[in-house]
Amino acid sequence: MDKIIKSISKNGHFRAFALDSTLTVREAQERHQTWPTSTVALGRTLIAAQILGANEKGDTKITVKVLGDGAMGPIIAVADSKGHVKGYVKNRELDYKKASTGEVLVAPFVGNGFLVVVKDMGLKQPYSGQVDLITGEIGEDLAWYFLSSEQTPSSVGVNVLLNEDSDTVKIAGGFMLQALPDATDEEITEIEHNIKSMPSIATMLTRDEPLKTMLDNIYGDMEYKNLGEFPLAFKCDCSKERFLEGIKSLGRQPIEEMIAEDHGAEIICQFCENKYEYSEEELKALIN
């Protein structure tokens, strides 16, 4: 089971999340049938959305949009505070790796553009923040968002490692570390050093207690408190009824055309690839 551990330093100067999102990203890859570069980019965006969702409470929904001008096209992920996330990438069929190392290349195919974060708290107007993509690697871009839009110095790491023989998802996860208002410059320097010198996310996620290992490495000698473990999962809230309401909102003429030309309708959810079919009778009931 995927999960996130939330923590805070005992002096209250830092907080950190550590996530294992392997099953989440694996399910996204299987549902969307993405190729390696697209899998890694979508996976990183899903993990980023899970990090942002874990920051929230109640019924708040977070939408993360990576809007670059590269061949990848838009990457969209939607998460809630309960650990659920869904998402898609426009171009699923990108497969580029460094010839020397086999490393999957992401940034060149994301390109230049924007990271947009939309918070929907159920109020009249959702909150929206936007920053330039500074690397296109997504983790660094999310850290830049926290600093620019929320004035919170942060370090974010997100990683998706694929199996070399099959390009399926081997491991996926990440972390977020934030300096809180009372953090001193010396403490921030110490934490930065810890993060720069710790093993890769993929390496830590293969350890016996992966998320504890990640937090131990982030905090180093600083004592911290575990605030709890929470489950994570790929979960879409689409339904046949919800899409039927969408069809109804189109109005009489488009529905009559569906009946006359196709004798029904088929809708595939963009976020999860679930397919919904509507009979001629179901469509007629919408306009009678």
Curated annotation (Swiss-Prot):
Post-translational changes noted in the entry: Under oxidizing conditions two disulfide bonds are formed involving the reactive cysteines. Under reducing conditions zinc is bound to the reactive cysteines and the protein is inactive.
Q: Name one GO molecular function term.
A: unfolded protein binding
Where does this protein reside within or beyond the cell?
Cytoplasm
Primary location: cytoplasm
Alphabetized, the UniProt keywords read: Chaperone, Cytoplasm, Disulfide bond, Redox-active center, Stress response, Zinc
* Entry-linked CDD domains: Hsp33
Q: PANTHER family recorded for this chain?
A: 33 KDA CHAPERONIN
Q: Which family does it belong to?
A: Belongs to the HSP33 family.
Q: What's the stated role of this polypeptide?
A: Redox regulated molecular chaperone. Protects both thermally unfolding and oxidatively damaged proteins from irreversible aggregation. Plays an important role in the bacterial defense system toward oxidative stress.
Q: What protein am I looking at?
A: 33 kDa chaperonin
Species the sequence originates in: Lactococcus lactis subsp. cremoris (strain MG1363)
Taxonomic lineage of the native organism: Bacteria, Bacillati, Bacillota, Bacilli, Lactobacillales
